Amino acid sequence: MTTGFLQKIFGSRNQRLVKQYQKTVATINALETQIEKLTDDQLRGKTDEFRQRVAAGESLDKLLPEAFAVCREASRRVLKMRHFDVQMIGGMVLHYGKIAEMRTGEGKTLVATLPVYLNALAGRGVHVVTVNDYLAQRDAEWMARLYNFLGLSVGINLSGMEHDQKQQAYAADITYGTNNEFGFDYLRDNMVYETDARVQRALNFAVVDEVDSILIDEARTPLIISGQAEDHTELYVRMNALPPLLERQIGEEKADGTGVEKPGDYTLDEKARQVFLTESGHEKAERLLAEWGLIGEGESLYAPQNITLMHHVYAALRAHTLFHKDQHYVVQNGEVVIVDEFTGRLMAGRRWSDGLHQAVEAKEHVKIQSENQTLASITFQNYFRMYAKLAGMTGTADTEAYEFNEIYGLETVVIPTNRPPKRIDKQDQIYKTAKERYDAVIRDIRDCYERGQPVLVGTTSIENSELLSHLLKQAGLPHEVLNAKQHEREAAIVAEAGRPKRITIATNMAGRGTDIVLGGNAEKQAAFIEADDAIPADEKARRIQKLHDEWETLHEEVKAAGGLHIIGTERHESRRIDNQLRGRAGRQGDPGSSRFYLSLDDPLLRIFAGDRVRSIMDRLKMPEGEAIEAGIVTRSIESAQRKVEARNFDIRKQLLEYDDVSNDQRKVIYQQRNELLEAHDITETITAMRHGVITEVVRQFVPEGSIEEQWDVPELEEALRNDWQLDLAIQEMVNESSSITAEEILDAVMTAADEQYEAKVAMVGRESFSAFERSVMLQTVDRLWREHLAALDHLRQGIHLRGYAQKNPKQEYKREAFELFAAMLDAIKQEVTRIVMNVQIQSPEQLEEAAEQIEERGGHLENVEYQHADYADAGAPVANVTAAAAATATADMVGSAMTHSGPGGEMPKVGRNDPCPCGSGKKYKQCHGKLS
């Protein structure tokens, strides 16, 4: 109450910011008359002047009014578009590293030119991030005319581009590209073996278009670069037979034993998108798997030797119970293609992680692709937080303002519209059944069609859009369907969607990137005519002129009919997606209307509010076909949406807390990697590693400060000879001197190791040997980092179980992840030292060959894939999300690069599960077996 009172007096934070920016707009407007008088060359010359002032130490903030005025004037001359005052405010919001919420049709693409121009003057690069290649290319080509006029270079970063093209794109003052491509380039840059192979510069300033889609909807979906791991195709096929034999349990068992309506083998939690085997389900699964010969008779699924089977059991269960064809995925050309739940687009090339995709392939009886091993991964949350300054724009951010601020430190500012909005948002209508709801939708569409009003119908899945299309065909109403299956015709359909009597069905319109103009988008239609080579030039000109002549009449006709009418056939679990659909109507002060039609069968209502609303309808004895249209019901639906949003925020925040652990480790590894790449000579590093490793080896057998009776000299001699190529007569030294100490033995071994090293360097030359060392170091770091990522994935899978032992899973994860990381760093030192000390070379050519073989065998896994795998879709518990099905890599690092002199250099023949002969206490396959 006090807050409301104070807001009335002082205005909200948003109003105060807008008022503050309006003062700067007045300063910019005052400069307009003198800027207008400049010639084109003088206007272009302003860029050089600004650059010199920035180089001399003037801040971009101080330069803002002049730079914005110059950019506005250049836009007026080149693009024939002058920025409105509210667009100048939007530009300031972006420059100051905030999120600008601007209604659809308010010209976000033009707004971005202001901060992009200003920040590009510093010469450190500006990235403009869009959701797909089409928008990146469209916006870059459109705005390049303006930037080039002002003397700035523009690059486009698209998937599939050549390495040289990417380097040029990033070297430009301004680079347009997709969030995926920027993220993958960052990961690839940290996998290269030469500094000039990198493409990105330091991450300076990014303007993210559709920021809510990228930083929130896709925040749970990490970018993953992976290579193929062990093949389990047969197992997925066998496991696919299991779910149909299991029955779902209805109801959850309570403490008193009640609550189960129908006993079964598994429970389904649709809200959390998880599936769990019941006790009887475990027994049944174990019995069936034993019959099929997959586990021993009477064995438990939780036995150590069967633990990987559990992964396959749950993957198959999730595939059958939580993921449905034409809703979560489609089958196209013999492949399972994911459908993006937020935009309805097909995500070709993207695969679910943790074996789920293979389980769905088995379910649909298509070819099962191999599981993958993670080579590198990062979430968008952690990637975009690395930019020195980050800003974003969208039509709907205010509902997620808290999350933007909490996770990214980004404030959301709602920008006033240039003209007052005229869209009428009608109350939701709720029906008892889906049939009644669709009948009402068809009636509304028919009414609009007869009055000449264009309609956009939003659905939440491809399945629903095709059902509605079928009903419209039965009703004899002509229409267009815009969903992931119609991707190619998308732009053409949207261009026509504002014409009179036009009916367009669309799966979520989020991120479509094209405005629906009342009367049709004449510019878009003209562009299609221009692009058609089959039409003669004079015919093109005639058709385009006719288009423009007709447009004014059609525009007024549609306005008179009420503008674009939006029909939502279901509420999305996010209010923001609903608002995006509504936002397609009423652009730039045009008339428009919207209404949502719901039924009690809708997932959101069924899970969160169905019983309450159904009891109201029953009490009111509502006849069939009658709808509830009441504010209280709409508010209860919005309350349910808020609950889902809060839960999703908690999931994203928790995921971030887990990912921050690997992110901190990633930063350390990538920093070390970059230092390695840039160093010409790493002798000091190699020497420090060698001294550390040799000290550890000697201390195992001759402890520090110990007496002779505690020493195991024969074992030390053998270890040095077999593992480190050091043939030393330490026993003789001990026998000859009665006063020899542990320190003197260590010094003697260290001196021998240093001499051996210097002899190799002298044989081939310092420069050649340094290059070899760097190659070995990079390959070892990369391979062990990959294995570490796999270990972290496995750790995260089971960490939630620590809660049962009254331990905090997050704290346990941090502690164990740190221990794994420390062990990995030790392993890097051990392996690099072992390879460098064991390599036998007589000439620089041999050394070069050894380095090449190490690089070929360790560095480039075959069939590398780029995934945007979805954690949440895999239905894993929050603390149990994994980056990818991660099998341990077994790249043979040394192999043919190592030749041993004499029989003493060979490793003893031992079984993979036997204790390692080095005395570490580990199994051979986990220790020296990795190298043999």
Swiss-Prot record:
Gene3D superfamilies: Helical scaffold and wing domains of SecA (1.10.3060.10), P-loop containing nucleotide triphosphate hydrolases (3.40.50.300), SecA, preprotein cross-linking domain (3.90.1440.10). InterPro entries: Helicase_ATP-bd, Helicase_C-like, P-loop_NTPase, SEC_C_motif, SecA, SecA_CS, SecA_DEAD, SecA_motor_DEAD. Zn(2+) binds at C916, C918, C927, H928. The keyword Cytoplasm applies. SUPFAM superfamilies: Helical scaffold and wing domains of SecA, P-loop containing nucleoside triphosphate hydrolases, Pre-protein crosslinking domain of SecA. It catalyses: ATP + H2O + cellular proteinSide 1 = ADP + phosphate + cellular proteinSide 2. GO terms for biological process: intracellular protein transmembrane transport; protein import; protein targeting; protein transport by the Sec complex. Its EC number is 7.4.2.8. One of its GO terms (molecular function) is protein-exporting ATPase activity. The keyword Membrane applies. GO terms for cellular component: cell envelope Sec protein transport complex; cytosol; plasma membrane. Its main location: membrane. Its cofactor is Zn(2+). It is a peripheral membrane protein. It is found in: Cell inner membrane; Cytoplasm. Belongs to the SecA family. NCBIfam families: PRK12904.1 (NF009538), secA (TIGR00963). Part of the Sec protein translocase complex. Interacts with the SecYEG preprotein conducting channel. Has a central role in coupling the hydrolysis of ATP to the transfer of proteins into and across the cell membrane, serving both as a receptor for the preprotein-SecB complex and as an ATP-driven molecular motor driving the stepwise translocation of polypeptide chains across the membrane. Monomer and homodimer. Part of the essential Sec protein translocation apparatus which comprises SecA, SecYEG and auxiliary proteins SecDF-YajC and YidC. This is Protein translocase subunit SecA. It comes from Burkholderia cenocepacia (strain HI2424). The lineage of its organism: Bacteria, Pseudomonadati, Pseudomonadota, Betaproteobacteria, Burkholderiales.
